[in-house]
């Protein structure tokens, strides 16, 4: 698989931090998203690559429903861009050909934590980490969309389940995740090559390409009434944790992606996973201050 990266949607912008800013009662007493909240919601749906109309509609409805639920709403997000260069040999298969492979021919890249569900859908299991004193182990379901022009692919998380204590598992429906990993590539001009890369081209021919990944992850959380932390404190800790996860996973993903290309370009069609540990994360803890939980 070329890219992996509560339930899910597309990439995001920041959202209001409390339910009071997002929703208000309509004339019959139902909660609805305010104009300001709707504007922010639409901004959150503008992914790195525009989603299909079906994806956009489904995402909008899912998020709007979630944001209309009662409770204290917290939002935190992370974005990470990363790139790796790879040598495209004269006699080898090209990067464009690699990026044009159908999802059914993807390597999972990580045989330990990625499982193929069907032709374009994969299950991803992240390592366990601590969040606000609870041990969490997220399991994601992601769908891959390969662009027809060979420019890359897009991976969207469609669903998430949490395992851990009974309290953690019962809270799975209090999360909504909006996540997209956009994988692209570009040519590297000769004058932009490093000395080492230029020496490779001089001796072996070929050219260098750059594979790029831009990942955006946003998490929406309804903070339980019994939770002893404020929305602001929850969001601060959430940003800290999500940034650590994204900053570790994306570079490892690209490293394994380029290694998979090297094997495939030389004629290896086994599509076996190239390694493990891609989703193993060392997440430190940030102190979360206990305050009046009504705030």
Label the predicted regions.
Residues 1-52:
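N-terminal chloroplast transit peptides
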Residues 39-139, 143:
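Hydrophobic ligand-binding cavity/cleft-lining segments
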Residues 50-52, 57, 263-295:
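Charge-rich (especially acidic), low-complexity segments
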Residues 113-120, 146-150, 199-207:
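Short, ordered beta-strand-loop transition motifs
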Residues 118-122, 136-140, 149-153, 175-181, ...:
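A generic structural signal for short beta-strands and their flanking turns/coil linkers
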Residues 124-129, 157-159, 167-168:
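Short beta-strand segments that buttress and anchor functional surface loops
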Residues 166-239:
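Beta-strand/loop substructures that line and gate deep hydrophobic ligand-binding cavities in soluble
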Residues 231-280:
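A conserved amphipathic terminal alpha-helix motif
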């Amino acid at each position: 698989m070329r890219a992996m990266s509560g339930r899910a949607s597309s990439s995001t912008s920041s959202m209001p931090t409390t339910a009071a800013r997002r929703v208000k009662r309509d004339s019959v007493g139902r909660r609805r998203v305010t104009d300001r909240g709707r504007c922010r919601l639409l901004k959150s749906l503008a992914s790195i690559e525009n989603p299909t109309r079906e994806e956009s509609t489904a995402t909008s409805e899912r998020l709007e429903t979630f944001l209309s639920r009662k409770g204290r709403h917290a939002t935190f997000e992370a974005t990470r861009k990363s790139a790796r260069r790879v040598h495209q040999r004269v006699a080898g298969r090209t990067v464009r050909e690699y990026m044009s492979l159908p999802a059914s021919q993807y390597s999972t890249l990580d045989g330990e934590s990625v499982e193929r569900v069907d032709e374009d859908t994969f299950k991803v299991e992240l390592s366990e980490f601590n969040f606000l004193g609870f041990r969490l182990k997220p399991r994601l379901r992601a769908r891959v969309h390969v662009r027809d022009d060979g420019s890359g692919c897009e991976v969207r998380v469609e669903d998430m389940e949490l395992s851990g204590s009974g309290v953690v598992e019962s809270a799975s429906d209090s999360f909504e995740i909006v996540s997209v990993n956009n994988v692209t590539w570009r040519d590297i001009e000769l004058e932009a090559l490093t000395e080492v890369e230029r020496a490779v081209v001089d001796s072996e021919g070929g050219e260098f390409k750059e594979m790029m990944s831009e990942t955006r992850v946003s998490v929406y959380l309804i903070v339980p009434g019994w939770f002893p932390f404020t929305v602001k404190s929850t969001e601060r800790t959430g940003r800290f944790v999500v940034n650590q996860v994204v900053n570790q996973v994306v570079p490892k993903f690209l490293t394994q992606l380029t290694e998979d290309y090297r094997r495939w370009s030389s004629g290896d069609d086994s599509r076996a996973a190239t390694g493990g540990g891609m989703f193993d994360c060392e997440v430190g803890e940030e102190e979360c201050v206990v305050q009046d939980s009504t705030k």
